[in-house]
């Protein structure tokens, strides 16, 4: 069974194919959790006669993506993908890079390719294969702690096939809105410090008043739910 994409990824994939055909470069900037990797996997599936070089920040990330692919499309086999981490690429020799011979290069979390050493490895690969089509996937194009560098501009010449903000993904129902839960835990040490300060108060009237406040605070804290209760109440789906 072929890889099936959700509508937001289908439209992004169509834009990717058109942009790759026109410019050879395409970036997709979608929030985490929207299934960006499936856009890359669909490109691999539709290009089985081509060699895909897939670069990822870590083995764990790529392994998790493959597990998600297997869950949704168990019959899909992508033997045309050569996978490397950015760190592995950084240390590859020219001969090893020459053995890759990619028709397509996928840069997952492409903003990471702006790092000094990882970026050098990516540039070495791109220089070796200037005609390979380049697809980038990331939740952001900006390296905020690196002079606000825009990696979509640097790597893809500004060719962004699809861009979606976190707010848009929530409004469109692609992602669930966040749920914030405020609670107090591990307060015993702080409470003991307040008790000690109250006991050392010389003025009896002030001390008596403070002790009343402390007792009221203690009763309130005793009624507070523990972390186990909070997790069970608000984290109903832990699969």
Segments and roles (model prediction):
Residues 1-27:
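Conserved pre-motif I regulatory segment
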Residues 16, 39-47, 121:
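Hydrophobic residues on the short alpha-helix immediately C-terminal to a glycine-rich phosphate/catalytic loop
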Residues 22-43:
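Walker A/P-loop
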Residues 51-58, 238-239:
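Conserved RecA-like ASCE P-loop NTPase motor core of nucleic-acid helicases/translocases
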Residues 58, 85-88, 137-141:
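A short beta-strand-to-loop transition that corresponds to the Sensor-1 phosphate-sensing loop
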Residues 62-101:
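Inter-Walker segment of RecA-like/P-loop motor cores
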Residues 97-143:
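SF2 helicase catalytic motif II
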Residues 146-238:
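Interdomain helical connector at the RecA1-RecA2 junction of SF1/SF2 helicase-like NTPases
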């Amino acid at each position: 069974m072929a890889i099936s994409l959700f509508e937001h990824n289908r439209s992004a994939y169509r834009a990717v194919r058109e942009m790759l055909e026109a410019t050879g470069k395409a970036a997709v900037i979608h929030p985490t959790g929207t299934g960006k990797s499936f856009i890359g996997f669909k490109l691999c599936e539709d290009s089985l006669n081509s060699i895909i070089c897939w670069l990822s920040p870590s083995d764990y990330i790529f392994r998790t993506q493959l597990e998600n692919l297997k869950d949704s499309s168990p019959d899909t086999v992508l033997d045309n993908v050569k996978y490397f981490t950015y760190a592995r690429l950084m240390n590859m020799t020219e001969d090893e890079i020459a053995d890759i011979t990619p028709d397509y290069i996928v840069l997952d979390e492409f903003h990471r390719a702006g790092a000094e050493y990882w970026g050098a490895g990516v540039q070495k690969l791109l220089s070796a294969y200037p005609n390979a089509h380049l697809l980038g996937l990331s939740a952001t194009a900006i390296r905020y702690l690196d002079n606000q560098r825009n990696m979509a501009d640097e790597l893809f010449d500004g060719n962004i096939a699809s861009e979606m903000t976190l707010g848009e993904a929530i409004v469109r129902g692609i992602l669930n809105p966040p749920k914030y839960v405020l609670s107090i835990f591990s307060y015993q040490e702080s409470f003991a410090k307040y008790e000690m300060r109250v006991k050392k108060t010389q003025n009896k009237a002030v001390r008596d008043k403070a002790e009343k406040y402390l007792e009221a605070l203690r009763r309130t804290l005793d009624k507070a739910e523990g972390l186990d209760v909070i997790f069970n109440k608000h984290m109903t789906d832990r699969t």
